[in-house]
Regions:
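Function-critical acidic carboxylates
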Residues: 1-117
């Protein structure tokens, strides 16, 4: 089965007030061997403590701190996420005052994706 790119959810926003988490709706495609990829970048003045989709914890795939740019980036993945419309929730380790950019993309046909490295 071929890997098929499904729904995408882009998000960029300056917090209207300090955030301790970010919640954004995303629709996971219906199909076998689903996968959800979420990436976000934010100021490195705060960290993050996790990411969930539909209440299921996602696996941290990669994180990077760009000290010179004063930004931190992370990406999370979830094999066989619940289909349909659910919330992505990114939890922060403290209040976030700076803009946060997030991008989520759904896949089907991800059989053989294996373990995150």
């Amino acid at each position: 089965m071929a890997l098929i790119i499904g729904n995408k959810t882009p998000f960029v926003q300056q917090p209207p007030s300090p955030w301790t988490s970010l919640t954004k709706a995303h629709t996971q495609n219906t199909g076998s061997d689903g996968f959800l990829f979420v990436s976000f970048i934010m100021s490195n003045s705060r960290g993050y403590s996790g990411c969930t989709y539909g209440g299921q914890p996602m696996t941290l795939i990669k994180t990077q701190n760009f000290g010179g740019l004063q930004q931190r980036w992370a990406c999370y993945g979830l094999l066989n996420p619940p289909t349909g419309n659910n919330n992505i929730v990114v939890s922060f380790s403290g209040s976030v005052f700076s803009p946060v950019s997030m991008f989520a993309v759904s896949f089907t046909g991800s059989s053989g994706a294996g373990v995150f490295a």
